[in-house]
């Protein structure tokens, strides 16, 4: 077991370095440019090479091949587009549907300006933002579930 030398805290040179914030690792190798210019590109290129190698050597199919002569009865988008699809499907005027879709991010952008006097991070002390979040989540789930149902029961989810 080696003997380590304890630093002499009465040394004025060491005290000056500690006062400047140089108490640890002022003798080491800097992260810039060594790590960022030499090590990170090697890791990134290695990751890309592994991905390309796997794609070339072992290609895998992403679902069934498309058949242009057999279309499904009802075409549904991916699951994350279900609420938007439901808005476009239920609104009779398509321009109004597009405007409703644009109103969602516009409404979310106005929430910080409505509650700009409230600096709290606690959601219970920010009632407007919490209410907008909860109502938006419920409406998005409701529209998403309704998009998977036929058009006549999509708005009521078949409950009424």
Curated annotation (Swiss-Prot):
The keyword Endoplasmic reticulum does not apply. The keyword Ubl conjugation does not apply. It is a multi-pass membrane protein. One of its GO terms (cellular component) is chloroplast thylakoid membrane. GO terms for biological process: mitochondrial electron transport, ubiquinol to cytochrome c; photosynthetic electron transport chain. SUPFAM superfamilies: a domain/subunit of cytochrome bc1 complex (Ubiquinol-cytochrome c reductase). It is found in: Plastid, Chloroplast thylakoid membrane. Keywords: Chloroplast, Electron transport, Membrane, Photosynthesis, Plastid, Thylakoid, Transmembrane, Transmembrane helix, Transport. One of its GO terms (molecular function) is electron transporter, transferring electrons within cytochrome b6/f complex of photosystem II activity. The chain crosses the membrane at residues 36-56, 95-115, 131-151. The 4 large subunits of the cytochrome b6-f complex are cytochrome b6, subunit IV (17 kDa polypeptide, petD), cytochrome f and the Rieske protein, while the 4 small subunits are petG, petL, petM and petN. The complex functions as a dimer. Component of the cytochrome b6-f complex, which mediates electron transfer between photosystem II (PSII) and photosystem I (PSI), cyclic electron flow around PSI, and state transitions. Belongs to the cytochrome b family. PetD subfamily. This is Cytochrome b6-f complex subunit 4. The gene is petD.
């Amino acid at each position: 077991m080696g003997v380590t030398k304890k630093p002499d805290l009465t040394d004025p040179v060491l005290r000056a370095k500690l006062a400047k914030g140089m108490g640890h690792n002022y003798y080491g190798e800097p992260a810039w440019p060594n790590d960022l210019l030499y090590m990170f590109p090697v890791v990134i290129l290695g990751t890309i090479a592994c991905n390309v190698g796997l794609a070339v050597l072992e290609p895998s199919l992403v679902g069934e091949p498309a058949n242009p002569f057999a279309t499904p009865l009802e075409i549904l988008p991916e699951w994350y587009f279900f609420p938007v699809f439901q808005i476009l499907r239920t609104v009779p005027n398509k321009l109004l549907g597009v405007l409703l879709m644009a109103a969602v991010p516009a409404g979310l952008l106005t929430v910080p300006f409505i509650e700009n006097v409230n600096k709290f991070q606690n959601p219970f002390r920010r009632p407007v933002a919490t209410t907008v979040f909860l109502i938006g989540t419920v409406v998005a789930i409701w529209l998403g579930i309704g998009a998977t149902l036929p058009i006549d029961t999509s708005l009521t989810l078949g409950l009424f």
